[in-house]
């Protein structure tokens, strides 16, 4: 995995990884620029990406993922494809980006109208909306924080509040942008409340990367990760709604307080060890990289909830 120099949510990425897969992360060199379109261009330069990918070569990854949303949408669809080609040339393995993974996930869901949440400024948020328009996706509503730094410090409550604000009109799904925004524990609650698939930058990145390995991302109550039904059945958009409200049956859903979620525990500042992004490969017995246990063993939510949604395992 190649990630920006300020990426601080390594722990969150691991939560989607099954225990037989190894994840390795490297970062792009530090750039003294606030989060902006200029920074997005700097951290997505092909030379920088190539160096990051080559830094991962010794671990023999089977897929390379560039974990940065703004860095992969700033050049438009053409620029995103060029980034993938540059990384593939450097590492000689399949490569993908967060924005490309988002488009892939929306196609998988059959979603063409989305609500959008970002921590960015208005100009960066608009650039993402323009990218989506180019690939045929309409943004029905949006909410953004206007941040230029320390995005990983945003609490889950703020993410949930923005999601509620953004979902107006008839959206097929909600997308929470930025790989530095914590989302893993918020997704199940938002899907139950909003009755639609909820996608996040880290989620779609890991889903798409693991998919190329023939593996499944770990994440209970996340619509994108539902197993495919028999051919001919509806897309996940309907499946997610039915999971909480079966056809012909209406019931009240009580979402547990977002305060019940564990605090965000970022990895903190990490010294750059190379260009942006993560590498993923099946774990071998000799691997020194620890693996993440599946998130299927979970504790129940507080009794105040009428749903059987699981509470994520506490951080170690």
Model-derived features with residue positions:
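Hydrophobic, well-structured mid-protein blocks that either form specific transmembrane helices
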Residues: 83-136
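Glycine/small-residue-rich loop that forms an oxyanion/phosphate-binding "nest" at active or ligand-binding sites
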Residues: 53-95
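C-terminal functional extensions of proteins
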Residues: 200-245, 315
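Periplasmic-binding protein-like
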Residues: 62-67, 115-116, 171-178
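Hydrophobic alpha-helical
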Residues: 166-190, 206
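Short, well-structured alpha-helical segments in soluble
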Residues: 45-59, 159-171
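Intrinsically disordered, low-complexity proline-rich tandem-repeat tracts
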Residues: 241-244, 254-314
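N-terminal glycine-rich anion-binding loop in soluble enzyme alpha/beta folds
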Residues: 1-50, 117-152
């Amino acid at each position: 995995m190649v990630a920006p120099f300020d990426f601080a949510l390594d722990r969150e990425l691991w939560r989607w990884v099954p225990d037989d897969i190894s994840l390795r992360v490297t970062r792009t060199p530090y750039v003294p620029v606030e989060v902006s379109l200029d920074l997005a261009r700097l951290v997505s330069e092909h030379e920088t990406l190539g160096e990051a990918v080559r830094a991962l070569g010794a671990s023999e990854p089977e897929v390379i993922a560039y974990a940065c949303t703004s860095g992969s949408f700033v050049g438009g669809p053409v620029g995103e494809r060029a980034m993938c080609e540059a990384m593939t040339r450097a590492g000689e393995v399949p490569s993908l980006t967060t924005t490309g993974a988002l488009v892939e996930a929306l196609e998988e869901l059959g979603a063409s109208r989305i609500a959008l949440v970002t921590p960015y400024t208005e100009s960066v948020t608009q650039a993402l909306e323009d990218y989506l328009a180019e690939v045929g996706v309409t943004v029905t509503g949006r909410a953004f924080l206007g941040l230029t730094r320390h995005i990983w410090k945003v609490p889950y409550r703020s993410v949930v509040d923005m999601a509620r604000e953004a979902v107006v009109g008839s959206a097929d799904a909600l997308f929470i942008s930025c790989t530095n925004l914590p989302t893993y524990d918020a997704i199940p609650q938002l899907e139950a409340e909003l009755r639609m698939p909820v996608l996040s930058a880290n989620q779609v990145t890991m889903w798409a990367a693991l998919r190329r390995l023939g593996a499944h991302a770990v994440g209970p109550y996340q619509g994108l990760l539902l197993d495919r039904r028999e051919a001919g059945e509806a897309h996940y958009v309907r499946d997610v709604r039915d999971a909480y409200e079966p056809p012909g049956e209406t019931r009240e859903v009580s979402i547990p307080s977002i305060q019940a979620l564990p605090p965000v525990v970022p990895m903190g500042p990490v010294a750059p060890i190379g260009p942006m992004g993560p590498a993923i490969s099946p774990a071998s017995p000799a691997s020194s990289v620890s693996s993440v246990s599946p998130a299927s063993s979970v504790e129940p939510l507080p009794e105040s909830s009428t749903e059987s949604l699981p509470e994520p395992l506490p951080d170690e």
